């Protein structure tokens, strides 16, 4: 039975060596492979105590991977789905809000690059940014700034 626990721990370390995982995500992955008598929660506690598993590192990693392509609401929604606590979400939201306009502008530039010539095209560009999770305020500011740059 001890060998199964080591196997489960080895599997957890292999997952964590590839990228950071949230406690909830890693627990879900390990539960699929757990045998009767394996205590996944105890293993997760052990990994957290040994600093192999960290919610804050996972949050930073996810924000870093997603920030260049997505808006605040999409990133925060994904963090929430991974079980990140509300206090951490509040801190992350405050950090993300400072550069949402710049990120929206960069995404717009990569996708479109030119200012919409008619209302239909403008609506299409705005919908694209909204689907990426950017706030209406950031989208409006990015579109206005793009229009000023074209003039």
From Swiss-Prot:
It holds the Pfam family RecX_HTH3. One of its GO terms (cellular component) is cytoplasm. Gene3D superfamilies: Winged helix-like DNA-binding domain superfamily/Winged helix DNA-binding domain (1.10.10.10). Its main location: cytoplasm. InterPro entries: RecX_HTH_1st (IPR053926), RecX_HTH_3rd (IPR053925), Regulatory_RecX (IPR003783), WH-like_DNA-bd_sf (IPR036388). Transmembrane segments: none annotated. GO terms for biological process: regulation of DNA repair. It is found in: Cytoplasm. Keywords: Cytoplasm. Belongs to the RecX family. Modulates RecA activity. PANTHER family: REGULATORY PROTEIN RECX FAMILY PROTEIN (PTHR33602:SF1). This is Regulatory protein RecX.
